[in-house]
Every structure is written in C-alpha cells, then in structure tokens.
From Swiss-Prot:
Topology class, membrane: Multi-pass membrane protein
Gene3D superfamilies: photosystem ii from thermosynechococcus elongatus
Family note: Belongs to the PsbB/PsbC family. PsbC subfamily.
Keyword Transit peptide: no
Chief place of localization: plastid
SUPFAM superfamilies found in the cross-reference section: Photosystem II antenna protein-like
Phosphothreonine PTM sites in chain numbering: 3
The protein's name in its UniProt record: Photosystem II CP43 reaction center protein
Propeptide stretch(es), residue numbers: 1-2
Subcellular location: Plastid, Chloroplast thylakoid membrane
Cofactor info, note text: Binds multiple chlorophylls and provides some of the ligands for the Ca-4Mn-5O cluster of the oxygen-evolving complex. It may also provide a ligand for a Cl- that is required for oxygen evolution. PSII binds additional chlorophylls, carotenoids and specific lipids.
InterPro entries: PS_antenna-like (IPR000932), PS_II_antenna-like_sf (IPR036001), PSII_PsbC (IPR005869), PSII_PsbC_sf (IPR044900)
Assembly description: PSII is composed of 1 copy each of membrane proteins PsbA, PsbB, PsbC, PsbD, PsbE, PsbF, PsbH, PsbI, PsbJ, PsbK, PsbL, PsbM, PsbT, PsbX, PsbY, PsbZ, Psb30/Ycf12, at least 3 peripheral proteins of the oxygen-evolving complex and a large number of cofactors. It forms dimeric complexes.
C-alpha cells in the first residue's frame, strides 16, 4: 500500500534512501548541493517579489482615491504612500502612477529572479565549490559562514541607508506630524545622538514607555536607520575580513540546520516587533494610511463627543459622568487634564490631531474652547468609526455597531499576521535548534519507528 510517507517515492531524481530525507522535507534534500539550493533560494525570492508586484497592481487597480486607504483593505499602498510617493497634504493621494511603477518594477524583478531560480534548479551545476569557489561553501567552514553573514549584513545596511537617502535627498517621506494634518517633507536634521537613539532600547515595553515602538518623530526614525545602516555595513566588513573568535567557535553549532534555526529566530523577533509597531505606532505607520490605532480611535470618539456637546452648550470642564468622574475631561494619575470616560485608560496617547490642543498640563481648556480646527474634527470623526477592533462589544468606550459596514483595519491584518507568522517562525526556530544541537551532540537522527504500534495494525482500507 502506498502512503503519503512512502519512503520509496522519488521526487526530482532524489529519494529517501540516497538523501536521508523524504520528499516532504523539501530543501533538506539539497543541503549539500549548493547549486541546487541556490536555485531554490532564488526561486523563493522570485515568488516573494512576484507576490509584491502582483498584489501591488491588484491594489492599484481597485484603489478609489476618494476613500481612505484603510477603508479599502490595502496593505501595500500604505507602505508606498508612507515613503512620500503619490501623496500630498493630509495624506491625500494625488497621483497613483508611482504605485503602478512600483508594481511593474517588482514584476520585472520577479521574472529575472524566477529565471535564475529555474536555471540554477534545473540547468546549473549541482554544486558550486568546484567551478565557482567564491560562491561555494561547506556548512562547517566557520570562516566562510561568517563571510556570508558579512555580505548579508552589508545588504541590510544598504537597505537601511536607502530609506535615509529617500528621506533626506530624494523627495522626503510622509510626516503625519507636519503642521495642518501631515505632509511630505525632507528630513534635514536626523537624530544622530547615540544616547537618544539607543535609549529607546532601554525603555520599558509597557504603557507610554513603549520601548522602540514609542518613537514619535521622523528625525529619530531616520537617525536610527543611519545608525543601524552604518553598524550593519561596518559589521559586515568586519565579518568578511575576520575569522570567528575561539569562544564563538565553541559556543555555536556550525551546521546548515543550525543556521536555519538562527535565521528563523531572527525573523520571529522581527515579526513580533513589526506586530507591535503596526498596532501601536502612528508615526512609522501614519493613521492617514493605516487607520487609527485602538487608543487613537477611543480618544477620537471622546474628542468628537466633547466637540459636539460643547457646541450644544455643555460645560465640558465640569460635567460629571454616571460614575461621578468627569464626563468629558478628568485628571490623569500625574495630574494632567485628559479625556474622561472609558478612554481614560489611553490617557498617554499621542497623535498629531490631538497634540496642538495640549498645554503644559495636559489638554488646555482654552484651546479646547477656542482653537479646535475643522481638520481635527473631521479626522477624529473618521477615526472614531474606524477602530481596529474585532469585537462586537465596545472596547475602550468605542461604540460598535453590529449592523455597520464590515470594516477590518489594516492594522488588524498586519499586527495579527505578523504575530501569528512570527510565532510559527519561533516554533520553527526551537524545532530546528533542537535538531541541530542533537545532531551536533551525536544523537541518532529521527525516531526509531521499528516498534511503533501502528505498523502492526490492519490498514484502514
């Protein structure tokens, strides 16, 4: 009887007996075939870039400029818009052609990568060591592995510097904090102070401290990319021209599966950080494109009702709510004037539509009575009804309507997907790290199934 796990099955000219891996182990069959593994990696990159290009064009073809991006389920166009392409004051889309160009460039790139993947998978040499020693490698060659690490670091550093160059010299990027409701601007004075940039790493991850996710200005973001880009480039050069120190040779497991586990752990970490950034941060992820954060929607609702009732004659400074606390305004634990009601839990929220109304001691009563601008009212009303909540009951006081339009915020998509995928990658990290350590310690690979009870049972069919 043939089963899915039939060890005699041959795929791509390789079977379990000759490689030590069954067909479902995927690229494990190519561990020692550097040429074929190169093909698999290039083809994989082609698939990724193809998705980016195709999805980009899909979003462009469905995009309605009159509606906010976050109301249209878009996740790629907001990223391009954040880079300052095709948008003007207030985040209004004034030109979709750059988005089309981005999609086409990715499609063309994916074709090149796809061709390279097919070539190296089917036509090119199985191993690179003999014909192209510079590109060849042996997994246990510690010096070669750290050199490859160096090349990767240099590429990452160049990527970080591309954002710096775009922000400082090639048109600027979108700043949600620009006066009047956001605009594209050139970052002329990025923060390069070491204590400021790396101080983010020392912050608590809780509440308003928010670790690195609390960054609220583009100067710090671009300055951080200058630091990271420079460190990656110099770190890459260091790893290319040096050999691992004795402690590193002893501490790490040096095998293909170990490197896979390290990579999966790094990607999982980045996934978790991206999850928090896309959910909480409204500077790197401007709310004009991604929709409001949860706290932002809650604060926007409190602000909207304050504006409405103040126009109707309510004394918003002294009105009491049903609990005896301030209905519209109250004091924070530190004495600041904050919005009242359930949104009190988000008292340390900061957003560009709200900050102009603050004074030295929180919200300024005089500004609330005399200085509220129409764009602030419009934006708050829009954000109030587009909270990134998947709940039928109210969260943070945000009114939810079960008969309303089925709105799912891009922040919900991005945060959830990055957390779930980050978790899967973390499990993969643990799995492959355990296997790599076991192999390095000399344990027998796999499980001996000779005495497995199921082997003596009658087939189901």
């Amino acid at each position: 009887m043939e089963t899915l796990f039939n060890g005699t099955l041959t795929v791509g000219g390789r079977d379990q007996e000759t490689t030590g891996f069954a067909w479902w182990a995927g690229n494990a069959r190519l561990i020692n075939l550097s040429g074929k593994l190169l093909g698999a990696h290039v083809a994989h990159a082609g698939l990724i870039v193809f998705w980016a290009g195709a999805m980009n064009l899909f979003e462009v073809s469905h995009f309605v400029p009159e509606k906010p991006m976050y109301e249209q389920g878009l996740i790629l166009l907001p990223h391009i818009a954040s880079l300052g392409y095709g948008v003007g004051p207030g985040g209004e889309v004034i030109d979709t052609f750059p988005y089309f160009v981005s999609g086409v460039l990715h499609l063309i790139s994916s074709a090149v990568l796809g061709f390279g993947g097919v070539y190296h998978s089917l036509i090119g040499p199985e191993t690179l060591e003999e014909s192209f020693p510079f590109f060849g490698y042996i997994w246990k060659d510690k010096n070669k592995m750290t050199s490859i690490l160096g090349y990767h670091l240099i590429m990452l550093g160049c990527g970080a510097w591309l954002l710096v160059l775009k922000a400082m010299y090639f048109g600027g990027i979108y700043d949600t904090w620009a006066p009047g409701g956001g605009d594209v601007r050139i970052i002329t004075n990025p923060t390069t102070n070491f204590a400021t940039i790396f101080g983010y790493l020392l912050r608590s991850p809780f509440g308003g401290d928010g670790w690195i996710c609390s960054v609220d200005n583009l100067e710090d973001i671009i300055g951080g990319h200058i630091w990271i880009g420079t460190l990656c480039i110099f770190g890459g050069i260091w790893h290319i021209y040096t050999t691992p120190w004795p402690w590193a040779r002893r501490a790490f497991v040096w095998s293909g599966e170990a490197y896979l586990s390290y990579s999966l752990g790094a990607i999982a970490t980045m996934g978790f950080i991206a999850c928090c950034f896309s959910w909480f941060n409204n500077t790197a992820y401007p709310s004009e494109f991604y929709g409001p954060t949860g706290p932002e929607a809650s604060q926007a609702q409190a602000f909207t009702f304050l504006v409405r009732d103040q126009r109707l004659g309510a004394n918003v400074a002294s009105a009491q709510g049903p609990t005896g606390l301030g209905k519209y305004l109250m004091r924070s634990p530190t004495g600041e004037i904050i919005f009242g009601g359930e949104t009190m839990r988000f008292w340390d929220f900061r957003g560009p539509w709200c900050e102009p109304l603050r004074g030295p001691n929180g919200l300024d009563l005089n500004k609330l009575k005399n200085d509220i601008q129409p764009w602030q009212e419009r934006r708050a009303a829009e954000y109030m009804t587009h909270a990134p909540l998947g709940s039928l009951n109210s969260v943070g006081g945000v009114a939810t309507e079960i008969n309303a339009v089925n709105f799912v915020s891009p922040r919900s998509w991005l945060a959830t997907s990055h957390f779930v995928l980050g978790f899967f990658f973390f499990v993969g990290h643990l799995w492959h790290a355990g296997r790599a350590r076991a192999a390095a310690a000399g344990f027998e690979k796999g499980i001996d199934r000779v005495d497995e009870p199921v082997l003596s049972m009658r087939p189901l069919d």
